[in-house]
Amino acid sequence: MKARVEYIKLPRCYTKTYRKIEAKKNNDGTIELTLEETMQVISFKLPPALNAKLEQIAIKEKKSKSEIIRIALARYVENV
């Protein structure tokens, strides 16, 4: 069995952006790899009471805490 391999040069990443690779098998037997940029990672501190409230909302909404924060921040930025 012969495999055709193509090499591509990936762009250098100077930020803390993480990348995700998806593999898809084509009908002709080849495998297509797709490189996607994902979100940047940031960190910050929350008071315990605010974190507890965030956890309650995340459980109630069945979403991650990160997703709740992204939604709230997007709404805030739109209204500034």
UniProtKB/Swiss-Prot annotation:
Gene Ontology biological process terms, A to Z: regulation of DNA-templated transcription
Question: Pfam families, alphabetically?
Answer: RHH_1
Described purpose of this protein according to its UniProt entry:
Essential for virus function.
Under what name is this protein listed? Answer: Uncharacterized protein C-80
| Organism (species) | Sulfolobus spindle-shape virus 1
Provide the organism lineage as a comma list.
Answer: Viruses, Viruses incertae sedis, Fuselloviridae, Alphafusellovirus
